[in-house]
Amino acid sequence: VMDVDCKDQKIENISGVNSTKPEAIDEIASADLVTTAVGLVILPRIAPTIAQAIEKRMENGVKEPMNMIACENAIRGTSQLKKAVYENLSDAGKAYADEYVGFADCAVDRIVPPVKSENFIDVVVEEYFEWDVEKSGLKGELPQIEGMTLVDDLMAYIERKLFTLNTGHCITAYLGNLRGIPTIDKAIADEEIFGIVSAAMKESGAGLIKKYGFDPEKHAAYIKKIIGRFKNPYLQDDVTRVGREPLRKLSPTDRLIKPMMTAAGYGLPVDHLVIGAGAALHYDNPNDKQSVELQEKIGAQG
């Protein structure tokens, strides 16, 4: 845990199997709760394995419910996983899943930068975390897990996180990249970048307050807390990690365009959100497939 008080935390009682091996199907089929943290684009790749596990539960006559939660950095990630899983189920499997498999969307918030360690299983995280799970998507007895908050109106929490943390984070990364600044903490320390990011988060926040009725003072405090997380020098979070996959981040439902359109829809200013989106369009990283594709599109189409 890399923060003001850095500490090592040993996680025990874990095991692993290769997700491409039959053993993975057995492990999933015997679970009552399955969570993912693989990245949105990977969900369709693991969906066939999950579907096979559901089919196996059906064949074995398992009537106890199983719940799926995709802890991904996207809106309704579990719904997207469900769609991919159902595409790989038989009609009987779909009917079984409708009755016995829950797919609960969630909002997950914790900065996890790449690990600079000799031990490949080490993970670096910040102290702060939030995990909000939509109750209505769960089947059977509600799980009681430390750190999990069960909520009714998940979309408010999803968009609060997306429009605040994710929006501010990626704008910091793209502006930092334009200035040749390597890490988020150093980028947000730049006075001009700090000003643009803060203003953009206030613009997205104004849209959230209009849409969901968040308390303005509490939301201002939430923004301040998020910016404090960006300043954490212990994470050494690269702007290339935070800015990766710019096409996804520029999509209509993601962290740049969605908050801009929400605020603009209420007639609110979006000047600094536009600057952030513009910085994303300038993201040119030859090691990032989406960045290369983005620059090719701009070169060909303007």
Placement of each model-derived feature along the sequence:
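Substrate/ligand-engaging "lid" and interaction regions
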Residues: 1-302
